[in-house]
Amino acid sequence: MRTLPDKAFDLAVVDPPYGINFSGKSDKHDGIVGGAGAASNRHYHIFDDSKPPGSDYFSELRRVSAAQIIFGGNYFADFLPPTACWLVWDKRCHDNMRNNFADCELAWGSPQLGPARVFRFVWMGMIQGGSGREERFHPTQKPVELYKWIFNRFAELGDKILDTHLGSGSSRIAAYDLGLDFVGCELDPVYYKLEEERFARHSQQLNLFID
């Protein structure tokens, strides 16, 4: 990011490693994520999230973008200013079920983005909201609908969007569907390849539908 000019992007929406050693909770020899129900049978490529980004990353992110939304912002409070804009993704988990799924996830938003907001969308193991069923191959994957909700609320047509940790590519698909300019980065070659394949399938299907 150091090569980018100030405010090169209108909005950065990022999901960096939280430093909670997610991969340490999985079966190291085949990447099977531990947990209850169907999620325990899902195979993921193992990645290392034990090292979260430091203060330099967040300083640069805020320099190159006019506004930011940072998933896991509750883990990075020491690096971020106070804000009223907390986005809560309510996964609508059942209260009477014992599982290892979080009921919600938090994202820090730049103070100028307004008050706290809640997005409700089922995302619990193999149970998903919406009319489609998204393929899942990344342990911290988020639904396309979540990113569409964010972009519809906080971005405008013509805005430039940045995602520094592309992961499964859900943000890219959402930006593509909404006609937003988008730049995404992914260091892990396995996830980069899977994301590219996922995006190619999605864009081809969308073009066939339009044609």
What is the predicted function of each stretch?
Residues 49-55:
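Alpha-helix-centered segments that form part of catalytic cores
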Residues 2-14, 18, 22-48, 59-211:
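Class I S-adenosyl-L-methionine
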